[in-house]
Amino acid sequence: PPGSTYKMVTTIAAIDSGTISRWTEIEDEGVYTRFEDAGYMPRCMLYTTTGATHGLINVMKALAVSCNYYFYEAGYRTGITAIDNVAKALGLGEPTGIELPEATGRRANPETKKELYDEGHDGWYDADTVAASIGQSENRFTPLQLCSYTAALANRGVRYTATLLKRVLSSDYQKLIRENQPVVASTLDISDEAYAAYSEGMREAVTSGTAYSAFVGYDVAVCAKTGTAQHGSGGSDNASFVLYAPADDPEIAIAVYVEKGAQGGTLGTIARDILTAYFSEAGSTDTVPAENTLN
């Protein structure tokens, strides 16, 4: 599962369905008791680890500190249809279009649940929506899909087909033989308010939230989101980390996923090293090193 890197999906769906505004506050009570009678009481990670809560917060702060409780309630109010529509438009559970065989993953929704379980299973519950809203349930995506999704967030809903090939030059670099042009794979009309909510929340994750330690004193403004996902197979949780940068004029999107990597915040240093390489002189793509050529 993608874990909390999925929360931007829920943010967009909740705001653009009119369910919340970016200023709507929800009280984090630690334990989500809406489904207590059914024995399902998920917890916010902060409460699980420290016994504390995030208190009364809006969606931007909830993204920055990765408050599960906020997104349990926002997802419940929004419903799975709106959430799933946003996830699909942003490329999650969809082919990226890369020139290699790829897994398409799957999105948590009633159709997926019906396919995965036998006919005796009695359908989709609101509790399923709550789990899906924080990137759990049946959500399963490839790292490339997470990267494509993050790039679409940076592009305010425009998702491009993924490709490995930028251009083909002659052996002496003097002739352009072929150059790939960007191809739009899908678009999502994201409102100004929803864009402001997730971009500011991801920025705050870096300046004061769960991604802070990896980017202290970093020269480039970064928007990022950490993710920690339970997988049910024992051992540490899976960890994910996504970012785009620069925050105000994005050039690059990065996704890092480590199975049993414990917490997404620990992957920030990996993403930072990639970002540093990209923005360094050595990371320039204007020229092609000889070892990357075919004669």
Question: PLM features: what roles do these ranges have?
Answer:
Residues P1-S4, V9-V256, L294-N295:
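Beta-lactam-recognizing serine transpeptidase/beta-lactamase-like catalytic domain environment
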Residues L146, Q263-R272:
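Short, charged, low-complexity patches
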Residues K175-A185, R272-N295:
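Short, gly/Ser/Thr-rich active-site loops of penicillin-recognizing serine hydrolases
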Residues V258-G261:
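Ligand-site clamp/hinge motif
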